[in-house]
Amino acid sequence: LPDGRLYHRSHVPGELIGEPGSLAFVPLTGERARLLTDAHVRLGRWVAKKDNESVLVYQNCNRDLAGLITSAADTHPVVREIRFLANYPVDTAAGRVTPGLDPTGVYYDEPPALRDLRPDPQCARDVLEDLVVDFPFRSQADRENFFGLLLTPIVRPMIDGNVPMHLILSSLERTGKTKLAEDVLGGIVIGKPTPAMQLPSTDEERSKAILSLLLRGDTIAHLDNIREFLDSAALASLITAGTYTGRYLGQSKMIDVANLLSLVGTGNNVRATGEMCKRIIPIALQPASDDPQGRSDFVYPDLREHVRQVRRVVLETLLGMVDAW
């Protein structure tokens, strides 16, 4: 197969599917292996005839051969590993990653809209303060914790270790928690709302959901509407482990997936175990009235459009802050 057609994540072979700037890692199935082989390779076998001659008979890839291809792909040196798949600029310990796959296993899927960014930290405070001007942060520390969350996905491949989960919380509903986690964080970093997931009721189901998220290549995720008391072994492992171990869907084997996820949760009046609290950075919102849903004094009523318009400037500011640091 052509070089760069197949990759693997934790020895699970797959393809990068989608348009530039929105690629996703999709595990290779037997059916897909057959289609790829037939598209790029002409298979044949020699069949003996009665007159002691042989004739070359061409054939399509069968299921057994597709299984061999899939098995070989997870360890073949031509099939390179992707540890981190990002559609926004990121930094490793060696510096800023250029488009494509770098030697550390970071793949930068550069979208056309982010070409030729010019990092500039000069107006960082003004740019970032204006981005969240409509959100009622309880304190300046909470606001700056959110700015730290914006920076986390950019420097995540650089950090040799774990990063805490950020938790956006409030005592009331409709204060803007989900908008902050999905529309602002996702809109700036990945150009679309942060992927949201509900925590399943059992740790086994949580582990399956987390493993699927990591294999797909998501770099940020939103745990929406967390219940009042947070206590999950699967979630604690996700926050603290450099690799996440789980059972590969549909198979009996266990796999270890590199865990470079930046995680944000939202909830009302959330409490957690002491062990979980050590792994969480709070971002508290405190509305000025008891009816935040009735608020109308927004500087930017169409938040998604505002984020779309300023995304490039905000990313240039964040990259400039990283460079200055």
Task: Identify the residue ranges that each predicted region occupies.
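Feature primarily recognizes SF3-like P-loop helicase cores of small DNA viruses
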Residues: 143-149, 158-166, 183, 187-237, ...
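N-terminal nucleic-acid engagement/recognition segments and initiation subdomains in replication
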Residues: 1-141, 148, 158, 208, ...
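Residues at the beta-strand->loop junction immediately N-terminal to the Walker
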Residues: 169-171
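Walker A (P-loop) phosphate-binding loop of P-loop NTPases
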Residues: 173-175
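Walker A/P-loop
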Residues: 178
